[in-house]
Amino acid sequence: MKLWAGRFHKELDQKTNDFNSSISFDSRMVREDIEGSIAHATMLGSCGIIDSTEAKQICAELKKILDEVESGALNIDLESEDIHTFVEGELTTRLGAAGKRLHTARSRNDQVALDVKLYLKKQCDVLYQQIQEFIVVLCHKALDYKDIVMPGYTHMQRAQPITFGHHLMAYSEMLQRDMSRLADTKKRMDECPLGSGALAGTTYPLNREMTASLLGFERVTNNSLDGVSDRDFCMELASDIAIAMVHLSRFSEEIILWCSWEFKFVELDDAFSTGSSIMPQKKNPDIAELVRGKSGRTIGDLMTLLTMMKGLPLAYDKDMQEDKEAIFDAIDTLHMCLTSFIPMIETMKVLPGNMRKAAAGGFINATDCADYLVGKGLPFRDAYKITGELVAECIESGLTLETLPIETYQKYDVHFADDVYKAISLESCVNGRKVIGGPAPENVEFQAKRVLKIMGVK
């Protein structure tokens, strides 16, 4: 069945037909297509555009078709051009003339825009809930390790001591922004395009607000041209997903480093690791590596959508068929990555001793030494210079700031006293950072509990 065959005298070339078809990937929207058709038929009957009895027949049969497809009793015909053609063809086979009335006052252009929006709205909710689940896992783990000292890094060099709980809460913040972006995107796509027709609306007296309400949309689109040609919602969701995947990729990179013998901060559970076919000792963080790699895939999906849309005149162009494979792939990728990543982090074994050992080296408490002098009345720049000289002294003598004799300290500045050793201890360095957003254990506990409350967890 072809919905556009009237003016043609030849059948479409078979290879071209295969090239033109989208049923292989848009069939996942069968529920959304039927939901949209039921709302459309209900509205047509209510407005007297088609007979109300026929409208009820159409709706009842569409529900049967959906039930049969989802139960496996009816297979989607992959020879159909797209999911819209399959559903309408199946309906017409069953109802005859009544089925042919369904497409009154509707184009595939506004139909597909509707289907994609309905599908993506649902997927926004799915991804939102998954990310929320991940945040809860991170918060619980942060509470467990709120006082475990580890090095904080800049330029991949040990910089200042923090806690592992603080580090985990940094990713919680990123993921909360991801949730916020998804919610914002859903708000902007909450406009029903049905009634826009091919591009110029319709002469039929439609009740667009009725179909929008039946389908759970907040409002209708305000311009028929924009209604059928807009794919901002696809690009925006793809951007949200790409950013979320970049966050997962950064976390993955750290997990990969932390699992190495050079760091040995964490150990992944066997259920989320693989081995080598030749090296018996290997335990590889393949899940984290795959997530890191797949982030590039979602960035590619975003680039596909942006590049596809950048040169299209209004209104609909066949190029826009390419939107679905890109956005579906992005959705599937993030969903799949989160499905494995969340339990990988939840079951990850933390090795506090190795974290603390790493934090004890590299003069990670030098800033606190400078702050000690500031507390004694010195300007920070002077304190900074003196501490730098002390670090150089330690390096030359093979000592640390903790083992450097007090006499040597006082050679550089008379303000140093025995209390400097307490001031530069790892516990003091971390516990003293009670500023909002700082790594002090009490801060980590407060922030984790605050976020859990926001997530609805008591």
Regions found by a protein language model. Give the residues of each.
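A helix-coil-helix interface module used to build multimeric assemblies
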Residues: M1-G201, L206-S213, T274-G275, D286, ...
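Glycine-rich cofactor/substrate-binding loops
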Residues: M1-G36, A97-A98, M279-K458
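Short runs of predominantly hydrophobic/aromatic residues within well-ordered alpha helices
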Residues: S37, H84, E88, C234-L237, ...
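Positions in alpha-helical segments
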Residues: A39-T42, L118, K122, M235-S239, ...
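Short alpha-helical scaffolding segments that buttress acidic/His motifs in well-ordered protein cores
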Residues: A41, L62, L138, I241, ...
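Conserved hydrophobic residue
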Residues: I49-I50, L74, K264, P379, ...
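Charged, flexible cofactor/metal-binding loops and thiol motifs
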Residues: V116, C124, Y128, L143, ...
